[in-house]
Design a protein with these regions (language model features):
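Bacterial N-terminal signal peptides
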Residues: 10-22
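Boundary at the C-terminal end of the N-terminal hydrophobic targeting segment
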Residues: 25-29
């Protein structure tokens, strides 16, 4: 019992040390970090299109079969306080995952809002790369898929932010983090889509914008069609972040393990 308590205490101290280290460094991202932010629009006519897929990420290292069943939201890139958007061609579709598989892991999430230990609870949805208002050629961007999990423990930032996409401008104050999205491998229809960036994760915060209606033509790996979009509470702001899973052996590089997963 004493040995277990000592081990648990060491893990706790290591976790706190990592948080303090990130904070002292100003929560600066790594060199391969993608700075793109996104926000969501509701799909006013959710598309029910069940598809079995196989996915693999840092939480499910052996991979698991799941089913996506409906396209419920669309992600548009945004400038947050004039943040960079390296690829304005890339958008994402939000597909609900039927299998709400539990994870129950702890992780340190770091972004420009700070660094906090969060509890990752269960699987919720998939982000698939998509284009907007492009010809229906079947081509989709070579970019990450993401598995997104319900997560708690990262508080709301203290400030509001200017947010702008090609449709509108807004000011939003994000609420407490609600989801964490991790890069994943996806297998579907006989094709394998590996992640292209295992560093950039997405921390997801509720926001409350209200917009007019928009009707873009959207194409992802599942379908191509017009979507009827509108923003109303709650929508979500996706903030690029880094993640370190806990408990971890502080003598080894977690990011090395993550990269090794996809070699």
């Amino acid at each position: 019992m004493r040995g277990f308590a000592t081990s648990s205490f060491r893990i706790f101290v290591a976790a706190i040390g990592l948080v303090l280290l990130s904070g002292s460094a100003g929560a600066q991202p790594g060199t391969n970090f993608n700075p793109t932010h996104y926000w969501t629009y509701h799909n006013l006519e959710p598309i029910h299109f069940p598809q079995p897929i196989f996915v693999q990420d840092q939480f499910f290292r052996r991979g698991i079969p799941v089913t996506v069943d409906s396209l419920t939201r669309f992600l548009n890139w945004v400038h947050k306080n004039n943040s960079a958007v390296p690829d304005t061609f890339l958008h994402y579709t939000w597909w609900n995952i039927v299998n709400k598989v539990p994870v129950n892991k702890a992780a340190i999430v770091t972004n420009q809002f700070g660094s906090h230990i969060v509890q990752v609870l269960n699987l919720e949805f998939l982000l698939a790369p998509a284009t907007k208002n492009q010809p229906a050629t079947g081509f989709t961007p070579q970019a990450n898929h993401y598995l997104c999990y319900r997560a708690v423990g990262f508080p709301s930032p203290p400030a509001a932010y200017d947010i702008q996409d090609e449709w509108r401008v807004d000011i939003q104050h994000p609420l407490d983090m609600e989801f964490l999205c991790t890069p994943c491998l996806k297998q579907h229809g006989g094709r394998v889509f590996p992640p292209v960036d295992t560093v950039t994760h997405l921390a997801v915060y509720p926001i409350t914008p209200i917009s007019d209606n928009f009707v873009p033509y959207v194409n992802d790996q599942f379908l191509a069609r017009q979507l009827f979009l509108k923003q109303f509470p709650y929508e979500y702001l996706f903030v690029p972040s880094e993640k370190v899973e806990l408990p971890t052996d502080v003598k080894r590089s977690t990011w090395g393990k993550v990269k090794g997963l996809y070699r």
